[in-house]
Amino acid sequence: MAFEIAYDGPVTVTFDTVAQGYSRDGCTVRIQPFWNDVKADYSGGEQGPPADTQFLGAIATVNCDLTKYELATVERLASTFDYGLTEGKVPLPGTLMRQEAKMKQLKLLGTKFTTTFETAFVRQATEFNAGVRAKFFRLSFECWMADYSATRILMTLVPTP
């Protein structure tokens, strides 16, 4: 079962060391763990409840609605992954995000805590309500555990100085 962490208040979003913008309403982080149920004869076999469960890792989905941003800066997120700035163009099929170094660091600088994900990529980057007075830019990131088998770090959370 997934769980969510809500960051209330202002959050500055930095991706690949570039400040993408500011979210006055905070961001949400959804942690999704992966499990494998282990069956055993003494607990009913395949039809019974698991005798144990094995943790297989976790990913985080981060959603930020930027209310203050430079459009040119956030549009560059698409070109980071070979999208280019041409609408409708997608990466080459078969592109491996981690193996081809397309994953970057994501940092959420909040009023109380700074959260860092070392391995993240953009899932969605869309401007909403363009052309009207109130508009925002929605960024959705997917974050994976660090590619260091000894550490298995998904994110670090430290008090904001």
Residue ranges and their predicted role:
Residues 117-161:
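Short, charged interaction patches at domain edges and termini
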Residues 33, 110, 145-147:
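Residues on the solvent-exposed faces and adjacent turns
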Residues 88-129:
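Acidic-leaning, charged glycine-interspersed low-complexity segments
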Residues 75-102, 152, 156-161:
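Charged, amphipathic alpha-helical segments and their flanking helix caps
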Residues 61-65, 105-107, 138-142:
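Beta-strand secondary-structure signal
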Residues 1-74, 114-136:
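Solvent-exposed edge beta-strands and adjacent loop segments
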Residues 65, 87, 91, 142-144:
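Residue-level recognition of well-ordered secondary-structure positions
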Residues 18, 80, 109-111, 160:
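Low-complexity, intrinsically disordered/propeptide-like segments
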